[in-house]
Amino acid sequence: MPLLLATTLANNSHHQHLSTTATETAAAAATAKAAATAAAAATATMLLTSPTAATHCLAAATSAAGVNVQITGQGVSATLNDDQLQLPANYAANVGHLNGFNPKDNCPPVPPTSERAFEGLLRLPQIQVKQEFMESPPERPSCHPMNHQQAPANSALATSCRGKTILNPWYLRPADGIGYHNYNSNNNNSGSGEINKDVSQQMTSACGGSDGQTCLPVSYFGMETLASVKQRQKSLPDFLIPLHEIMFQQQHHYQQRTMGTLINSLPPGLVGYPPQKTETFKSLTPPKALQHHQNNQNHQIPQNHTGDHSFVRHFHERDRLIREHQLKHQQLRDVEEVLQEQEQDEEQEHETLRKPHVVPSELEHNHHWHGVVCDANGHATRLLHIAPPRAGPTPLPTHQQPPVGEVLPPNSTSFSTIVDPPKEPSIYEQPAPNGRHCRPANKVMRHMSNSPTPPSPLRSLSDCGKSFEEEELELGENCEMPQNLSSKRQARELDSELENEVLDLAPPPKRLAEEQEEEKVASVNPPQPVAFAPEEMHQALQLQLHSYIEMVRQLAPEAFPNPNLATQFLLQNSLQALAQFQALQQMKQQQREDPLPSYSTPLAKSPLRSPSLSPVPRHSKSQQRTPPNSMTANSLGMSSAVMTPNTPSMQQQPQLQQSTPKPTSGLTVASAMAKLEQSPEETTDLEELEQFAKTFKQRRIKLGFTQGDVGLAMGKLYGNDFSQTTISRFEALNLSFKNMCKLKPLLQKWLEDADSTVAKSGGGVFNINTMTSTLSSTPESILGRRRKKRTSIETTVRTTLEKAFLMNCKPTSEEISQLSERLNMDKEVIRVWFCNRRQKEKRINPSLDLDSPTGTPLSSHAFGYPPQALNMSHMQMEGGSGSFCGSSISSGE
């Protein structure tokens, strides 16, 4: 509620803007008024001779003014004196610090009553001053007992109630004329366009008293009458409510809850200025019983959206009205559209009934459109005599009609009320999920796309079994429908006859008859696989390739700058497609002859195979697998001979002890493709490697060898040392495809030798000495060897080994043998030193890739050695083949 009237200039925060004459006048007037009010209050009430009487007087005065003072009674009697209530007009000055003034201002209160005035009394913890919104109607002066003894004076502050639109306290709002124009001031319509006005003139003119009492304007305290609101409405638009009134609204409520000593109303009994006009003030608080009649009169006044509502509520209300208006118009438009549609439908029905029915005489131009014929004008005419029967009972005409047709407009999609079959999913009109119909794409352009390069003429295997009509159906379902108004309306409007009818999606009788004939023929004679001669297919593919290359050159000449490369690429793709097609035919024939057994467990999946590498599913006759070395060429099929490394596998059908004879066409294509150059890893299949790794691990464990034993044995037998890590990675399929292909024949040879040796020894434990007796004379068995003593290497030998390591970090077995002979050291010691040195280098430089099985020479500058220090001419081997670059297969850590 609007706060206390600052009757003294000393406690006014804006007193620096006032003149000295106004200061003297205001001080004199305040002193005179205060003395008169004190005398009147003392004579009207009891004599304040005791602390109890003073307390009761204070409580009565403040409660009548709208301020609730709760006194607990502890420590009050010692602080109350008679002289503290002598000047009730100084009540505002003594509690001014509670309203935002500085109590320790340079200008003391006028006049100082004592050292401990009301300020000290209100600071006691036992007293709480609470703000209450209390109504005090000015037309009933009997409600205020202290107003009977006060002379009427001019004042704009009548009661403690606040105007509705001003929700923030007065001390949070800047003064009028300081920096901005206050829209809520009474001087807004004075005619002067000045923004910075004299504050003293406003303060003195607001009260309007002849005594020159200085006070703040009405709008400064946030109180407005109906007259001021109406006056502001004339010049202020509806939406120009000052922004600070909205911004400070939440702050005001926060202070209203928290500040218990906030006094937002000035007691009219203490001030002594009754209102000049008896105007009704608006209130935000619920009405009391005494003011019920008056508030009812106030509520009967029609409320407007300028001052009666807040800024946000005004816009919410306006948006709601706009939405209601738009909704009403939309409903009216919908009703009009429905009526217009009904009128159009009736007109079309009358037109179709008036027109003579055209009987089509010839059906030569019926391009397989079931029930639809195009006449010379391009209109589609539907035949009624070949329509399928309805699924539900429909009203039929009483008289018989010859088979006639209905002329459909080209763009019309509305239903008709005459006997018309439900629209079938034919080529002419395709039913879409959203209820619309569309025409399919052009048949001639069905293979063309938006891309500059047309698609390949080679169709994928997944499209081989599709008929032409199925493709047209798919094209019709995927095409986009025109978003016109008639299609939107038709989606929600149906004819009265077709509304409750069951949709007949059965195929037309012509197609049903064809399918029945095909089923009969298929039941009598099973279809034989299409057998094309390879020469005919090759010629057809060549023709397609030539036409395709010409199309590419015409449409996008920059797509293939080199036509020879394009021809080779397309030829390779065509050969692959031909091989896939033949393999698919062979697999289908095999499935018809010998149906696949039902599997209880799913087929094993290869971790090295991606789904894109094998477009055709693989099937096997049984769950048992044999090592790949025992498979014949026929059991592997022709996929390994035809596929490139990009598509290493198309199908594998390992058949145990049987194989279907391949047609001659497959052998011809395979022999033609076998002439191309192929690396060893291209002929090796991923699944074959996987099966061999699994078999090798099982056989090794059964023979009793460790992975390290296999690596050492292969180094002594074949001259290539392998570490335990390399064998482990091979078994776990963690090596690259190239290294796996190169390791496979060596490990396969070792496995065969181990099997033969075990068979010769009668199944005993295999001793590696029987295999390496001709190559080396190692006395101890690998299986029974013990841990060797730690070897100490001399400084000169270590320097030589470091130089050799810089040249090649992974030497071969031959290079290690040469180093051992030159340094008079054991070959195993040198091999272990190189392994340890690689691990050390990996810890020092983690970025170096020392795990690859290919040995690469390290840079001399990376280790800080000058190139001259790495001159190892004495280590160069004879014959020009001497190099410390390791082979592609060496021990990998």
From Swiss-Prot:
Residue spans binding DNA: 786-845
Annotated InterPro entries: HD, Homeobox_CS, Homeodomain-like_sf, Lambda_DNA-bd_dom_sf, POU, POU_dom, POU_domain_TF
GO MF assignments: DNA binding; DNA-binding transcription activator activity, RNA polymerase II-specific; DNA-binding transcription factor activity, RNA polymerase II-specific; RNA polymerase II cis-regulatory region sequence-specific DNA binding
Gene Ontology BP terms: central nervous system development; ectoderm development; generation of neurons; neuroblast development; regulation of DNA-templated transcription; regulation of neural precursor cell proliferation; regulation of transcription by RNA polymerase II
Polar residues compositional bias, start-end: 623-646
Entries under Pfam families matching the protein: Homeodomain (PF00046), Pou (PF00157)
Cellular component, GO annotation: nucleus
Region ranges (Disordered): 586-668
SUPFAM superfamilies the record matches: Homeodomain-like (SSF46689), lambda repressor-like DNA-binding domains (SSF47413)
Tissue expression summary: Initial expression in cellular blastoderm stage, then in ectodermal stripes during germband extension. Broad expression in the neuroectoderm followed by limitation to discrete subsets of CNS cells, and expression in specific PNS neurons and support cells.
Domain POU-specific as annotated: residue spans: 681-755
Alphabetic keyword roster: Activator, Developmental protein, DNA-binding, Homeobox, Nucleus, Transcription, Transcription regulation
Free-text function comment from the UniProt entry: DNA-binding regulatory protein implicated in early development. Involved in neuronal cell fate decision. May act as an octamer-dependent activator of transcription. Could also play an early role in specific ectodermal cells, and a subsequent role in the embryonic nervous system.
Cited PANTHER family: POU DOMAIN (PTHR11636), POU DOMAIN PROTEIN 2, ISOFORM B-RELATED (PTHR11636:SF89)
Homology family: Belongs to the POU transcription factor family. Class-2 subfamily.
Name used for this protein in its record: POU domain protein 2, isoform B
Gene name, Swiss-Prot/TrEMBL: pdm2
